[in-house]
């Protein structure tokens, strides 16, 4: 299959009049679209077997072929593709029949370049929105990434999670970055009796102690500089539901006594307001840090840890559940080629072997990112090793002993590893000890 060099959409023009094809093509290519032309139903069918199109302009009078029959076949072959019927004034009634049969719209010949451009932009926008909606609906219907597993250890964890979800016990989820701790937390909320209420997330590393207290418990107007309005806080938002404290190991030590008190008594005060309030909240927390080591070094309260880990679930790294790698890769590929309307339909044997041999330090998050990138840049039906962008990395993700690496190569490898295990660029910049603008420049420099 050919790769689209333009970034706005693939368009198929089907008309038996070469002058119309030429005029439409020049107009649309001037707008930056990728355009293919066919002068018969058979030629259109051949093109559609080789390429993925987002939009088709189909002449209703196509020589010996009936445009309505061609439309029906297109709807079967490429149900996602928007089809605009092109017709003469005398055949408007038939064009209306075509819309009832599944066409998106119709244009009356002769049409102006502005009419063609407007119709194209409108239909491609609808196509993009439909793709995003389908992706979201698929996310709702299907098991979340990494939670549909063939790994015995993962299946045992999921079974335990389902059993404890129906209780109100606090749960601590442990695991490396990218293993799906947040998804498991949201799944537990969905399996619980609190599912109809909110599941509110706080990302602990992103907030200072001062901001964390305000974000968690709320504040009154004038409580501090810039507090022009009162806020209710995440605890209030989660009342009756679940509060998920992501990366709890980064929760400010000075604020841990207030969190402990809330977990024990369900009581809290907003910043700048002495009134004691209550909230019925179930606590889920997750971290990739060793909290017991942090307790021993005085960086985390032992009594808070005991309150958080009534139930502990430890998610295995992706390399420890290798039987799920290809299943997840296939699922990600199917999702992204649908979302981006790309031609890839599977992986070559070499690519599948590379996926299995890689250690995935960034776990499921890294796998998802690798497959998303591959789905975008792959111009054919099979994803090759070169599309994955990780073929030359050694299995242990460390520089080879004795390898002559430049400082730039070392820096690139280090930044790439941090990016793979960070949820946001800000978090990656913080880990690297540089500001976001410097990280942006380095990513551009190293093509990361």
Swiss-Prot record:
One of its GO terms (molecular function) is ATP hydrolysis activity. Pathway: Glycan biosynthesis; alginate biosynthesis [regulation]. Residues 10-124 form the Response regulatory domain. Residues 147-376 form the Sigma-54 factor interaction domain. It comes from the Bacteria. One of its GO terms (biological process) is regulation of DNA-templated transcription. The modification 4-aspartylphosphate is found at residue 59. InterPro entries: AAA+_ATPase, CheY-like_superfamily, Homeodomain-like_sf, HTH_Fis, P-loop_NTPase, Sig_transdc_resp-reg_receiver, Sigma_54_int, Sigma_54_int_dom_ATP-bd_1. SMART domains: AAA, REC. Residues 425-444 bind DNA. Pfam families: HTH_8 (PF02954), Response_reg (PF00072), Sigma54_activat (PF00158). Keywords: Activator, Alginate biosynthesis, ATP-binding, DNA-binding, Nucleotide-binding, Phosphoprotein, Transcription, Transcription regulation, Two-component regulatory system. Positive regulator of the alginate biosynthetic gene algD. This is Alginate biosynthesis transcriptional regulatory protein AlgB. It comes from Pseudomonas syringae pv. tomato (strain ATCC BAA-871 / DC3000). The lineage of its organism: Bacteria, Pseudomonadati, Pseudomonadota, Gammaproteobacteria, Pseudomonadales.
